[in-house]
Curated annotation (Swiss-Prot):
ATP binds at residue 577. It comes from Macrococcus caseolyticus (strain JCSC5402) (Macrococcoides caseolyticum). This is Leucine--tRNA ligase. Gene3D superfamilies: 3.10.20.590, HUPs, Isoleucyl-tRNA Synthetase, Domain 1. It is found in: Cytoplasm.
Length: 802
């Protein structure tokens, strides 16, 4: 007999919606905030990868409600961004309508999976009542001096008519559409995330996050200590600075390299080299930073025709340009020490430049990067690395040509996009050159509706074409001004959405401070590892700014974070439309049911593992739920006669073991092993002639967070008059986890005569009396004298007789 998942799931989804079952409670003394990374509502709808993380947070939310917590478990939509705009450009449709339609699909799919979201808290980043506060936060950043305009060399994609982030450029072409990308300087809004670099680094220590993820953030921030050194250009009134972590190797600096974009390149390039330098700069502009720093690629470069002077030994150092030096890192210039740096060594070999060892221990076949005594280094000779660095910095500072410095790989956050479908930046530039933010009482600054959202082509956003939006007049002074036409990146709305869920309808502030105190930090945040750096770093940055403003009272937004693994196609390949291996959850819900999909995805393996989808595995998950239903319900839908009010001793131990194991495993997100234990319980249930009703009620509660529909149905059949949602979580009895009886071996002269079940911890004399009373033993010792009886508690009795 199989249960009818379609009827049961529709029935309970309607019940939950009609009864507002998952409306966030506020009346208990414990709070738990379980958050999903909210989705971008694409045209494709949900795929089976989405529900994995959503099911995990849903299990924890349902589990915590039963444990007596107020649970905040919301859902919303990260709905601005490139794909909707690209669709609108391709089809001529309005991105707002497209987005609305996609959200409706996502919401239907999510509701059909039985997730216990409080839909009264639903948010949408494109809702003016939401982005009013995204704009408000931008204004606070501006007031604090953390938002500024700069000319930045950016990834410009002429075909898309926009600037792309480094992550959106792959091998010199746009990730979307494969269009060529070049580097060109443009006026951009930038946020000063670097001001928070040390705090972003230090506060990672306090977080319960995977260590691998913390390391990714540490590497992205990339803090390094060293020195900044000034180099004079020979015969020209110019100098440039380099940052180095190894100022002690300065005597081994035999050439210098500037990035092709360095501001000094034009001024120091000789006439003979001008053509080669210009051609090289154009070539470098077509590469992404990632390609340029690829260690495996051959080094390229061009001599500028000028020389720098080594400030320690006075030697001439040819100045080259090469794309392995980035304008955005350090000072955009390096002193090259080929004897002790792998990249510098390869470059020197390629172009026949001098290699001068200044640390003992190497040979001339490769760069020596180990420690050793300094040589060929004047007064640094004989010192080791640490001493050498310290002394070199003292000498630099004494000569006035350098100083101790901390550098970061982290760059300020390029915040503007030359697109239409994003939050307008609330800034006006006036004809006298001054700049002001839009008065806060006038927020939200609405995104104007327009038919023409093709990029302007000039690098400005399509908003630049809408005169009634762009042109403003100050009502007091009559001065004319222009609104900012860049929009915010998609990251903006997702930087703070977890705060808005706490108080989503507040029109006076982001959220009530008392509610923020009550719910923050987020107790559990689950999402994909692809957001390990950017989203999480940006959200942490904004949170720290809001902390400094007194808006929030915690230093960090997300206390515990977990990355679910990826669900791959059946052949262990990533699911993609082009491979035709995408599994649509709608199909699975129709054929097997939402409970089966949830159970299967949690049973595939550990939550953080990447595992291939298997139709057999899905069938197995359904068979288990059928077995649960068959054990408890008769063909006619009534409760099985096996279920009794009487105690059933044979099931005591496995029941209490199951409560303990499932509770412990849910706490650690070990859902696959929790399910295994529930399978053990059901197997034992089939062997038992009777089932105690309290055991069954407890079991149904344990299964509920994973399979909520079937368990609501079973709960009703067990006499429940309300939803199982707020029933108390089962507790186990420690004393019932151990057996009250044990099986022992009975031997005569070392030969097995019988196995017998006795009370656990029976004392030796009782064991002897028991063994001697057995018929098999009496037969074996008939006519013999018992010489000795050896009893080993809980194990065996051996009777020696002859």
């Amino acid at each position: 007999m199989s249960f009818n998942h379609q009827t049961i799931e529709k029935k309970w989804q309607k019940y939950w919606l009609d009864n507002h079952t998952f409306k966030t409670t506020e009346d208990k003394d414990k709070n738990f905030y379980a958050l999903d990374m909210f989705p971008y509502p694409s045209g494709a709808g949900l795929h089976v990868g989405h529900p994995e993380g959503y099911t995990a947070t849903d299990i924890i939310s349902r589990f915590k409600r039963m444990q007596g917590y107020n649970v905040l478990h919301p859902m919303g939509w990260d709905a601005f961004g490139l794909p909707a705009e690209q669709y609108a450009i391709d089809t001529g449709n309005d991105p707002a309508e497209f987005t609305e339609k996609n959200i409706a699909t996502f919401k239907r799919q999510i509701q059909e999976l039985g997730f216990s979201y409080d839909w009264e808290r639903e948010i949408n980043t494109t809702d003016p009542e939401y982005y009013k506060w995204t704009q408000w936060i931008f204004i606070q950043l501006y007031k604090k001096g953390l938002a500024y305009v700069d000319e930045v060399a950016v990834n410009w994609c002429p075909a898309l008519g926009t600037v792309l982030s480094n992550e959106e450029v792959i091998d010199g072409v746009s990730e979307r559409g494969g269009h060529p990308v070049i580097r060109k300087p443009m006026r951009q809004w930038v946020l000063k995330i670097t001001e928070y670099a040390d705090r972003l680094l230090e506060d990672l220590e306090e977080l319960d996050w995977p260590e691998s993820l913390k390391d990714m953030q540490r590497n992205w921030i990339g803090r390094s200590e060293g020195a900044e050194v000034a180099f004079e250009v020979e015969n020209l009134d110019h100098s440039f600075k380099v940052f180095t972590t190894r100022p002690d190797t300065i005597y081994g600096a035999t050439y210098a390299v500037l990035s092709p974009e360095h501001e000094l390149v034009a001024a120091i390039t000789s006439e003979e080299q001008a053509e080669a330098v210009k051609a090289y700069q154009e070539q470098a502009a077509r590469k992404s930073d990632l390609e340029r720093t690829d260690l495996a690629k051959d080094k390229t470069g061009v001599f500028t025709g000028s020389y720098a002077i080594n400030p320690f030994n006075g030697e001439r150092m040819p100045i080259w340009i090469s794309d392995y030096v980035l304008a955005s890192y350090g000072t955009g210039a390096i002193m090259a020490v080929p004897a002790h740096d792998e990249r510098d060594f390869e470059f020197a070999k390629q172009f026949g430049l001098d290699i001068k060892p200044v640390i003992e221990g190497g040979d001339n076949t490769s760069a020596y990067t180990g420690d050793g005594a300094h040589i060929n280094s004047g007064e640094l000779d004989g010192l080791n690395k640490e001493e050498g660095i310290r002394r070199a910095i003292e000498l630099l500072e004494a000569k006035g040509i350098g100083e101790k410095k901390v550098s970061y790989k982290l760059r300020d956050w390029l915040f503007s996009r030359q697109r239409y479908w994003g939050e307008p930046i609330p800034v006006i530039t006036w004809e006298d050159g001054s700049m002001t933010t839009v008065p806060e009482e006038e927020l939200p600054l609405m995104l104007p509706k327009t038919e023409h959202i093709k990029p302007s082509g000039t690098g400005e956003s399509p908003l630049a074409n809408i005169d009634e939006f762009v042109n403003v007049t100050d009502p007091v002074t009559g001065m004319k001004g222009r609104r900012e036409t860049n929009t915010m990146p998609q990251w903006a709305g997702s930087c703070w959405y977890y705060l808005r869920y706490i108080d989503p309808k507040n029109s006076d502030m982001i959220a009530d401070p008392e509610l923020l105190k009550k719910w923050l930090p987020v107790d559990l945040y689950i999402g994909g590892a692809e957001h390990a750096v950017l989203h999480l770093l940006y959200a942490r940055f904004w949170h720290k700014v809001l902390y400094d403003l007194g808006v929030v009272h915690t230093k960090e937004p997300f206390q515990k974070l977990f990355n679910q693994g990826m669900i791959l196609g059946e052949g262990n390949e990533k699911m993609s439309k082009s491979k035709g291996n995408v599994v649509n959850p709608d199909d699975v819900v129709a054929s097997h049911g939402a409970d089966t999909l949830r159970l299967y995805e949690m049973f595939m393996g550990p939550l953080d593992a990447s595992i291939a989808w298997s139709t057999n595995g899905l069938d197995g998950a359904r068979r288990f739920l059928d077995r649960v239903y068959r054990l408890l319900v008769n063909e006619d839908g009534t409760l099985s006669e096996k279920i009794t009010e009487q105690p059933v001793g044979s099931m005591e131990k496995v029941y209490h073991q199951t409560v303990k194991k499932v509770t412990d495993d849910y706490e650690t997100l070990g859902f696959n092993t929790a399910i295994s234990q529930m399978m053990v319980f059901i197997n034992e249930g089939y062997k038992s002639e009777q089932l105690n009703i309290d055991h069954i009620r407890g079991f149904v509660k344990l299964l509920n967070p994973i399979a909520p529909h079937i368990t609501e149905e079973l709960w009703e059949k067990l006499g429940g008059t309300e939803s199982i949602t707020y029933e108390a979580w089962p507790v186990y009895d420690e004393s019932k986890l151990v057996d009250s009886e044990v099986e022992i071996v009975i031997q005569v002269n070392g030969k097995l005569k019988q196995k017998a079940t006795i009370a656990k911890d029976m004392d030796k004399s009782e064991m002897e009396t028991f063994a001697l009373s057995l018929e098999a033993v009496q037969t074996a010792i008939e006519g013999k004298t018992v010489r000795k009886v050896i009893a080993v508690p809980n194990k065996l009795v051996n009777i020696v007789a002859n």
